[in-house]
């Protein structure tokens, strides 16, 4: 069905393949060396499960570093341990239907309402979009600020107004989910 079962993520977490560079205090391996990920990617490429492995590479090497550098201590304590075990799968949502990955054309907005943000818009071609529990979402928060008017907003599975569209058909990488996301 074009989606790697969550059990694969849990198994990867159990064997230390997820969050290896997350500090040990959050359950990670504490490895601060890019070569570990490179070796892992090479080994996985020989297994024939490259679709699910690419989702894990995105999780480990693209998304997790944002949480490590930008999340506050409470967020790290809440999210990082589950990212390491595979209980939480992550995604990053940049690409939009009418703008592609050109951030200057981002139409998705986030407007501050009290202590939270209300996000409106849509994203497409989001790796791990169906399975993800946490989606780091690029939003325009200040239209007057040009390139400085963007923010990364974390959207959690089950949040009101956050819907997943279909799992997109692709020519390859059939075991990797790629989704449309809608925010209203």
Language-model regions, residue ranges each:
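A structural signal for short hydrophobic beta-strand segments in well-ordered beta-sheet cores
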Residues: 108-111
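A short core secondary-structure module
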Residues: 116-164
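Short Gly/Pro-enriched turn/cap motifs at secondary-structure boundaries
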Residues: 83, 98-101, 125-128, 142-144, ...
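Flexible, small-/acidic-enriched active-site or ligand-binding loops
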Residues: 105-106, 158-184
